[in-house]
A protein has these predicted regions:
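Conserved residues at the C-terminal ends of beta-strands
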Residues: 10, 93, 143, 156
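Generic structural signal for well-ordered alpha-helices
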Residues: 45, 79, 103-106, 129
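Glycine-rich beta-to-alpha transition loops that act as phosphate-gripper elements at the mouths
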Residues: 58-62, 69-73, 96-100, 117-129, ...
Length: 159
C-alpha cells in the first residue's frame, strides 16, 4: 500500500469515528446553518480568477517526507504573515497522523484572517466537505483517485 492509500484509509477511519459523534444528516444541517462571509460572492473563486498570479500559502506542521517541519507551530502568526505578505488564500493541513494537523488550526485561522481558507486533508467522504464548512473553509482539496465515484460530482451548495 503506497502512502496515498494509507492516508486515504486512515481518513476513512477518522470519518467513521466522526460519524459516530455527529451523523451525516446532522453535519449537513450544521453546515447549512454555519455562516461564513468568505463563502459569499464566491470569494475563493474570485481570488483564483483575478488578473495576475494568485498565491495559496500553506500552514503545515509536518509531512511524511520531511517529518516535523515546525516544532513550535505558531500557525496563527504564520497565517497572519501570509495574509500581510499578500496571500490570496491559506491552505491549512488538518490531517493529524502524518501531517500533525488539527481541525482547530483551520477553525482558528479562518476566524483570524480575512482571506479564504482551504481545508487540506485527504477527503474521501462528503461528510468531510460539510465538516470543512463548519470549520470555516471556503474550499477543500479533492484528490480524485481517493474518491470512489465514476466522475467528479458537485455536492449541493451549502453557503
Amino acid at each position: 500500500m503506497n502512502i496515498l492509500d494509507q492516508l486515504a484509509e486512515y481518513s476513512r477511519l477518522r470519518v467513521a469515528e466522526d460519524k459516530k459523534k455527529i451523523s451525516l444528516e446532522e453535519m449537513k444541517n450544521i453546515a447549512i446553518q454555519t455562516k461564513n462571509e468568505k463563502l459569499c460572492d464566491f470569494a475563493f473563486e474570485k481570488v483564483l480568477k483575478k488578473d495576475g498570479l494568485s498565491f495559496i500559502c500553506e500552514c503545515k506542521k509536518a509531512s511524511p517526507s520531511k517529518g516535523l517541519i515546525e516544532p513550535d507551530f505558531r500557525y496563527l502568526e504564520i497565517a497572519r504573515e501570509y495574509e500581510n505578505a499578500g496571500a490570496d488564500c491559506i491552505s491549512v493541513l488538518t490531517e493529524p497522523k502524518w501531517f500533525l494537523g488539527l481541525d482547530e488550526y483551520l477553525k482558528e485561522i479562518a476566524k483570524t484572517v480575512s482571506i479564504p481558507c482551504i481545508r487540506k486533508d485527504f477527503t474521501v467522504d462528503e461528510y468531510q466537505i460539510y465538516q470543512a464548512k463548519t470549520l470555516g473553509a471556503a474550499a477543500v482539496l479533492l484528490i480524485l483517485s481517493l474518491i470512489h465515484i465514476s466522475e467528479p460530482t458537485r455536492p449541493e451548495p451549502i453557503s
